[in-house]
Amino acid sequence: MVREPASTLLPPTSPATPAPHRLLIGRRGMVPTGANVIWKIQSGLVRSSTWGEEGDMISLGLWGPGDLIGRPLSCLDPYELECLTAVEVVAVSDPALESHESLVRSLRYTERLLSITRLRRAEAKLASLLGWIGERFGQPGATGWEIDLRRIPLTHQVIAELSGSTRVTTTRLLGEFRQAGRIHRRDRALIVRYPETLYPPARLSA
């Protein structure tokens, strides 16, 4: 069942605008997925997802400021855009004029995430996913990516759904990663250590 967006509509800049061009949506609200609307994220974190035949949610990606999202960019049905934080989005009338690079970047991020979920070993999937999230949303530190958990609320359930593993397996592996020093918490940040081959790595390019 599709949930209604918990959103606040701001007035359009011009009476000729056919639909609200800007939305403020609360955490756990849903970004509208109208057939012809593409949104550009101004702030916040959005998760795109669909549902399997047995009703299980399938995460498709995480999207942040500068990314383009919306029904025209997906061929899946159902297709949902859930706000993991408070989100501000603006409607893009012509994505080709707005930014061709944003579309290319979105496709590349999705491709990488899908390749991670196809890994067979749960440990490899989780390690690759944490690295992907670090490159995508973290800041490079002295020894690893620093992910601000106030801005990127990574619960065990969210991580499990993104990696395609169960929550029990994800929780167990996260504990093993902590014991091995591969991840650790500092204040409200999660530190994901760089792989030795990427120490220190260059930031992910679009």
UniProtKB/Swiss-Prot annotation:
Domain HTH crp-type: from-to ranges: 120-196
DNA-binding region of this protein: 156-175
GO molecular function, one term: DNA-binding transcription factor activity
Alphabetical keyword list: Cytoplasm, DNA-binding, Stress response, Sulfate transport, Transcription, Transcription regulation, Transport
GO cellular component, one term: cytoplasm
The keyword Ligase is assigned to this record: no
Entry keyword annotation includes Transmembrane helix: no
Principal place of residence: cytoplasm
Localization (cell): Cytoplasm
Induction of synthesis: By sulfur deprivation.
InterPro entries: cNMP-bd_dom_sf, HTH_CRP, Tscrpt_reg_HTH_Crp-type_CS, WH-like_DNA-bd_sf, WH_DNA-bd_sf
CDD domains per UniProt: HTH_CRP
Disulfide partners: none
Function text: Probably regulates the expression of genes from the sulfate permease complex.
Protein's name according to its UniProt entry: Regulatory protein CysR
Species: Synechococcus elongatus (strain ATCC 33912 / PCC 7942 / FACHB-805)
